[in-house]
């Protein structure tokens, strides 16, 4: 075997760093590695040591991830090793310094009394990571993570319909609107941010799965930067970039038409209800135990009472009554219990307000604010301003 050839792309990289920071960085990059890579090198993570520290990166032509870690670099260079294997190893190591160095066509890793020898892959076969587009604006990472989580719950998981697997991001100056739908529910969140150009306008569709992973990585309240380009370069590269906290990632934009969602949001309601989120959630989970595969939970709204029911004679029935503030004509409507509890978990408030039109049309859920006053007059009731809505299609009632 030609050892010179098997060692192509490796270098005398040698470094030492804390186990915890190494494991965290490798695990974050490894999350984005493909399960079934089209070529073997795409299953690897690239480790590059320089005067500025250690950089760990991964790329599968769709998503790139790169993180910088503080490390003592004894010798600069780059090496490519299996990402998931390295992630498994670093997470299992004792909490002691990790020593890592290239040894011929392998790498040696030691931590305490544990020693590993891992094969390397050819660095020169690894694709070059894309350049982050120009910065567009920033916002706190915890705000970004919360907003993404609130809308991603409604994103589709059928990848034959790519327009439903993304999160629509609309930017107009200092306002960002996020939206996602799987045809059965729609979630929309509006938030403010610091934009570099006050007249910036853009609309893109970003894979929801990637956004969720990226958002979860930074929830400490530090700033996160969103990059779409600037001026005539907005979206030109077909990339969406996110950076912050020493981490940066890019993902290719989805080339698909997102549904025109605003026309789906009702401007007024014929009936409205306000109820405690925790009580309603627990009651839904309880009565849904007799629902056939989560088929439906029925909600009967009347004067001060909400009756939840589920099931049928052949599988069993369940009912529970809850106190509710309700105004409008008595209403019976049914929902998929899983979709309903998803919405309740996403409003992020102690109480939730429902807006109804008819039992066959979508209901609107929104967080109840401290300033809300439940109406006592006859409808119709105008939809109130809110920074979050969850629109849910009902299930057809039997008969």
Curated annotation (Swiss-Prot):
Q: Does the keyword Translocase apply?
A: no
Q: Provide a Gene Ontology MF annotation, just one.
A: DNA-directed DNA polymerase activity
Q: List the disulfide bonds.
A: none
Alphabetical UniProt keywords = Cytoplasm, DNA replication, DNA-binding, DNA-directed DNA polymerase, Nucleotidyltransferase, Transferase
**Similarity comment: family membership:** Belongs to the beta sliding clamp family.
Function of the protein: Confers DNA tethering and processivity to DNA polymerases and other proteins. Acts as a clamp, forming a ring around DNA (a reaction catalyzed by the clamp-loading complex) which diffuses in an ATP-independent manner freely and bidirectionally along dsDNA. Initially characterized for its ability to contact the catalytic subunit of DNA polymerase III (Pol III), a complex, multichain enzyme responsible for most of the replicative synthesis in bacteria; Pol III exhibits 3'-5' exonuclease proofreading activity.
NCBIfam families given for it? dnan
What name does this protein carry? Answer: Beta sliding clamp
């Amino acid at each position: 075997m030609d050892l010179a050839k098997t060692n192509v792309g490796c270098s005398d990289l040698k470094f030492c760093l804390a186990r915890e920071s190494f494991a965290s960085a490798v695990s974050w990059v490894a999350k984005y590695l493909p399960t079934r890579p089209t070529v073997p090198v795409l299953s690897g993570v690239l480790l590059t040591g320089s005067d500025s520290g250690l950089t760990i990166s991964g790329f599968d032509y769709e998503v790139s991830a790169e993180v910088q870690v503080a490390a003592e670099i004894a010798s600069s260079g780059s090496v490519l090793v299996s990402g998931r294997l390295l992630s498994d190893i670093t997470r299992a190591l004792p909490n002691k310094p990790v020593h890592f160095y290239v040894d011929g066509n392998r790498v040696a890793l030691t931590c305490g009394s544990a020693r590993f020898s891992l094969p390397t892959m050819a660095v020169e076969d690894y694709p070059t990571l894309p350049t982050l587009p120009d910065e567009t604006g920033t916002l706190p990472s915890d705000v970004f993570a919360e907003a993404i989580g609130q809308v991603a719950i409604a994103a589709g998981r059928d990848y034959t319909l790519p327009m439903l697997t993304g999160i629509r991001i609309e930017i107009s100056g200092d306002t960002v609107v996020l939206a996602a739908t799987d045809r059965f529910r729609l979630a929309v969140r509006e938030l403010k941010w610091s934009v570099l150009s006050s007249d910036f306008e853009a609309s893109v569709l970003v894979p929801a799965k990637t956004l969720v992973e990226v958002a979860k990585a930074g929830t400490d309240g530090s700033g996160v930067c969103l990059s779409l380009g600037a001026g005539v370069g907005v979206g030109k590269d077909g990339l969406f970039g996110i950076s912050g906290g020493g981490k940066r990632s890019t993902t290719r934009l989805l080339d698909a038409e997102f549904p025109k969602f605003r026309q789906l949001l009702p401007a007024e309601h014929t009936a409205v209800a306000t109820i405690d989120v925790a009580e309603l959630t627990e009651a839904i989970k309880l009565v849904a135990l007799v629902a056939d595969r989560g088929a439906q939970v029925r909600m009967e709204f009347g004067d001060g009472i909400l009756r939840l029911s589920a099931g049928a004679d052949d599988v069993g029935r369940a009912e529970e009554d809850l106190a509710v503030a309700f105004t409008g004509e008595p209403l019976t409507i049914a929902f998929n219990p899983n979709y309903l509890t998803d919405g309740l978990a996403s409003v992020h408030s102690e109480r939730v307000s429902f807006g109804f039109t008819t039992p066959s049309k979508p209901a609107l859920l929104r967080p109840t604010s401290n300033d809300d006053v439940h109406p006592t007059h006859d409808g119709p009731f105008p939809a109130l301003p809110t920074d979050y809505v969850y629109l849910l299609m009902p299930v057809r009632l039997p008969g």
